[in-house]
Regions:
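Short helix/turn-capping signatures at newly exposed starts of structured segments
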Residues: 1-169
Length: 169
């Protein structure tokens, strides 16, 4: 079950779901069978779940590489930033965000990008993603193997009041 109030944690996850998880692992938390599945291109699959989150999986390795909030998600980034807040409040709270004209999103080097509604000037979506998303070789799908080699999988993390288990390869 999705935790609509879980914190949004850059490079880690949100909604009680961890980045780098496999589809089968996420399916144990939330039924992907009931989610709207979209094949975005020959390498990406997206699941839209309960108007709360979008999950982006890489087709080559089956790993979750991006999670995006939708309208019904209530969790916060850095205990303050949330869907529906104004862009002015976003920038006031964290001045590291800058607007990327090409992508049309606010970005931060902290592993987040935020899409806004230009008519209301409010935060529409918040995305967290894996560090490798910006790598030139991201599409080859080999990025997750370094975590397996480095032995950092299969550990339990407690983040706030949310104990999340790092996914198994």
């Amino acid at each position: 079950m999705i935790d609509y109030y879980a914190p949004i944690i850059p490079y880690v996850g949100m909604a009680g779901i961890l980045l780098y998880s496999k589809e089968e692992e996420v399916n144990k938390i939330v039924s992907l069978d009931n989610a709207e599945k979209k094949i975005l291109n020959d390498k990406w699959i997206r699941y839209d779940i309960d108007n709360a989150v979008e999950l982006f999986f890489h087709k080559i390795n089956g790993k979750l590489f991006r999670i995006t909030t939708l309208e019904d998600y209530k969790g916060k980034l850095f205990e303050k930033i949330k869907v529906g807040m104004t862009v002015e409040d976003l920038i006031e709270y964290d001045s590291s965000f800058y607007y990327d004209e090409f992508e049309e999103v606010y970005e931060s080097d902290k592993g987040i990008f935020i899409e806004t509604d230009p008519q209301t000037n409010t935060v529409k979506w918040i995305s967290v993603y894996i560090k490798e998303l910006d790598d030139k070789n991201f599409d080859d799908g080999q990025w997750w193997y370094k975590f397996f080699r480095n032995g950092i999988l299969n550990r339990t993390r407690k983040i706030g009041n949310h104990p999340w288990t790092t996914p198994i390869c």
